[in-house]
Amino acid sequence: MQTADGSNTVYNAVVGENYHSRNGALQESRHVFVNAGLHYFLDTTRANTVSVLEVGFGTGLNFLLTADYCTAQNITLDYCGIEAYPLSPEMIGQTGYEQYVSRGLWQQFNQQYTQSMLAPTTLNANSQLPTANRQTSTANCQLQIAHCKLLQFDTEKTFDIVYFDAFAAAHQPEMWNEEAIAYTVKFMKPGGIFVTYAITGNLKRMLKALGLTIQKIPGAAGKREMLRGILEVRD
């Protein structure tokens, strides 16, 4: 279905909710995750590498926008998405998101989407650039999609940023309880960033108890506020 900003979302019949806000899939993804998460981290750290854990990979829009920016800025990206109900490759190809990212990235994503659920895969997002441009880019983009529920996910990695993009608590309350939030936070690096479209008193209390400093910032269209948390660095 088309959302208010003209971008598309997909309805998940199992959960009973769309993957993105009806007020605009593209604007929500850019505002909540790319701007408040990725850009904030890069602006404050000046890093040339970044790792992202997304809870709720969904349509892949957050990944695509993140990878497109990192490729353009020559930033190495390690991206892991958790998804219990992965969309089919055919559905991914029908989202229309190719208009928001480079042709090379879109083609690589579609080609590697299924493979990335089996093992981490490297996307050569610069494959459609002229040879001279490709040679000046040293950044790479690694994608892994974990086809499992959150509490079944495991890795030895820790991440710079968490995109917490689970379905709303009204549809998936188990994703917003203390066990799920604590399990997610354990995969964060000290100083790491946690961003989500939701902000509730209970969520703020849980994150504070887990050692995060909470920032309330303006939300995407249709929401007054969103939440950004920063995991405190402890001696």
Q: What are these language model-derived features?
A:
Residues 49-58:
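Conserved class I S-adenosyl-L-methionine
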Residues 177-190:
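A short glycine-rich, Lys/Arg-flanked "PGG" loop and its adjoining helix->strand segment in the class I
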Residues 200-235:
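Class I S-adenosyl-L-methionine
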Residues 191-198:
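Conserved beta-strand signature within the Rossmann-like core of class I S-adenosyl-L-methionine
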